[in-house]
UniProtKB/Swiss-Prot annotation:
Residues 1-33 form the signal peptide. PANTHER family: BLL3847 PROTEIN, CYTOSINE DEAMINASE. CDD domains: Bact_CD. This is Uncharacterized protein YahJ. Belongs to the metallo-dependent hydrolases superfamily. It comes from Escherichia coli (strain K12). NCBIfam families: PRK06846.1 (NF005312). It holds the Pfam family Amidohydro_3.
């Protein structure tokens, strides 16, 4: 693994500031009118397909691998027609075969179909994105407590723009192929429930083309900011997950903070998704305490996500294996931004052991970090650079991180996606195969969510 290690070392040196930030927190062709389809163009040049039942021709689909000496060296593909009805893929057909000649048909232009990508850790409710460029000077030695104080001053300035900028962020995500997300949303005394209400209003408007879970996030400390009553109100108001934050370094009482977080989840039958940045032994202790809590509480099985979990980078291989085995049994997941600084997260080791590993943007141009791109294909590319030897099969496998484990081909090179009755949620990519898409972060040309074209265009 010398190639991978040297690449990781290089990225580590060039990416230290990215991890420090994480510790705190194509042009599209104009649409053509289809003869049989009902189309119109939105102001942002996104074509709108209003037909509930149609054919999409000239779709490039992966069909298998070609092997040399037992190693995949090339991905086989074929152009096919995909029949879509009521948000589902109902059939894969020979290209341009239309059994029902009365149905509208569109043309994907030979672009590669890949599963929709998923941004499973983002903050849609607080961002500079969509407004004027802005970066903040954060001196060396700035602590998370300093950032909390800064945020308490800034949140009232950001709130008037919450809905407008959340809409812009969703546009950005869709342009990168993402239609499924999980957003953390500030719940603390400064914001109250305003951010939640604003985000829910945006998601209600965008629900036809964008699915998003909401984590009620006590950004200023669950205990420190005395946010438990607000968190309970957020659960009653429809938040899907109970959030948490650094129970030792912020709240100063690890067990009490985690017990409070879990109790809220149990009282309202919700999941848990906690920000855990701590890299001291307290971070390892918090992870072990959470795993033990889930082991003792069957109602929490499959309901815990640990975001960031930087403390895992301080464990040796055997310790990670032992913890991963317990996490698999309890269906505990990890959400990581794939940090590239001095901390080398054991993401591949966790994934290989069967732990569900997800990724996300985290911040997109805000007071925590200016670097977020909103591109899950870029995250898969970064994962590949850090963790694998770059061959055809390994590159194609790395796509799992972007798509929530949905891949066109299985390990044997057999097609497993798309198939009949799958959601018609996918992205068209200007690439010859998923390996190329990961390696080159290939341009996206159209994004579909449950049969609806939500970004980009196809031809008629």
């Amino acid at each position: 693994m010398k190639e991978s290690n040297s690449r990781r070392e290089f990225l580590s040196q060039s990416g230290k500031m990215v991890t420090a930030a994480a510790l705190f927190g194509t042009s599209v062709p104009l649409a053509h009118a289809a003869v049989a389809g009902t189309l119109n163009c939105e102001a942002n040049n996104t074509m709108k397909i209003t037909d509930p039942h149609y054919y999409l021709d000239n779709v490039l689909l992966e069909t298998g691998f070609d092997y040399e000496n037992g190693v995949a060296v090339q991905t086989r593909t074929a152009r096919q027609t995909v029949e879509i009805q009521d948000g589902k893929i109902v059939a894969l057909r020979e290209n341009k075969l239309h059994p029902d000649a009365t149905l509208p048909h569109y043309d994907a232009g030979g672009k590669l179909m890949l599963p929709t990508t998923r941004d499973m850790h983002i903050h849609l409710d607080k961002t500079f994105y969509g407004g004027p460029w802005r970066s903040l000077n954060r001196p060396a030695g700035t602590t998370i407590q300093d950032m909390i104080k800064l945020e308490q001053k800034m949140l009232p300035e950001l709130q008037p723009y919450t809905q407008e900028r959340a809409e812009k962020l969703i546009d950005l995500l869709q342009s990168k192929g993402t239609t499924i997300a999980r957003s953390h949303c500030n719940i603390e005394p400064v914001s109250g429930l305003k951010n939640l209400q604003n985000l829910q209003a945006v998601l209600a408007r965008r629900q036809a083309g964008f699915e998003c879970e909401i984590v009620a996030f006590p950004q200023h400390g669950l205990l420190l900011s005395k946010s438990e009553p607000l968190m309970r109100e957020a659960m009653q108001a429809g938040a899907h997950y109970v959030g948490g934050l650094d129970p030792t370094s912020v709240d100063g009482a690890m067990e009490k903070s985690l017990d409070t977080m879990f109790q809220i989840a149990l009282d309202y039958d919700k999941g848990v998704d906690i920000h855990l940045h701590e890299t001291t032994p307290a971070g390892v202790a918090a992870i072990n305490y959470m795993v033990e809590t889930v082991e003792k509480t069957p109602q929490l099985k499959g309901k815990l996500t640990i975001s960031h979990a930087f403390a895992l980078a301080t464990l040796n291989e055997q310790q990670v294996d032992e913890l991963a085995n317990r996490m698999v049994v309890q269906q505990i997941s990890i959400a990581s931004t794939v940090p590239i600084g001095t901390l080398h997260m054991p993401l591949k080791q966790l994934h290989d052991k069967g732990v569900k590993v997800m990724t996300g943007t985290d911040s997109v141009i805000d007071h925590w970090s200016p670097y977020g791109l909103g591109d899950m294909l870029e995250k898969a590319n970064l994962y590949a650079q850090l963790y694998i030897r770059p061959n055809e099969q390994n590159l194609s496998r790395s796509l799992f991180l972007a798509t929530g484990d949905v891949l066109p081909l299985n390990e044997k090179g057999e097609r497993v996606w798309p198939k009949a009755q799958d959601d018609a949620s996918f992205v068209l990519v200007d690439a010859s195969c998923s390996a190329e898409a990961v390696a080159r972060i290939s341009p996206r040309t159209a994004t579909f969510h449950k049969g609806q074209l939500v970004w980009g265009s196809v031809a008629g």
